[in-house]
């Protein structure tokens, strides 16, 4: 996570005076951290992590690998991954840039492994899909809403979220973005949007 002093420092680096940087840092942070889900957080975390990304991308290129990052998920991919040589260097770069590697989230996958990266399943090397467990969860919620009604479904699962339907439509839009040919996702979006108009 990125703490407010680093955010404040980022604003100073790009030219804001100390007092303005302090106010902007306070506005962009919640409980002294960049909050997940805020529209400002991705851009600020990318600015803060720029130097780390540059160093890790250069390291990956040395070994013929590709480096990508989404939020705090770092991915190195390639045909051969020399663990013993590259991992210590990755950890050093991360720590040099004042971040801490999360060992619990470190995974190594080979060609036959089930690969889920940033919530997307990578099948057959190139095909992107939503994990089956996520599809089952979405299908179940859509089914109960369309057969029992939104209010009854929310009562049954104990949800008081006024934006529940919008969130479910958002999940389906995400599914459709990953799998554009998936007719279930498109049909469900249309059905839930019709239902939404009645609320």
Q: In which residue ranges do the predicted regions lie?
A:
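Catalytic palm active-site di-aspartate
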Residues: 37, 41, 62-79, 119
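Right-hand nucleic-acid polymerase module
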Residues: 2-14, 18, 25-31, 35-38, ...
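Short, surface-exposed recognition loops or helix-turn segments adjacent to catalytic cores
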Residues: 21-29, 62-74, 105
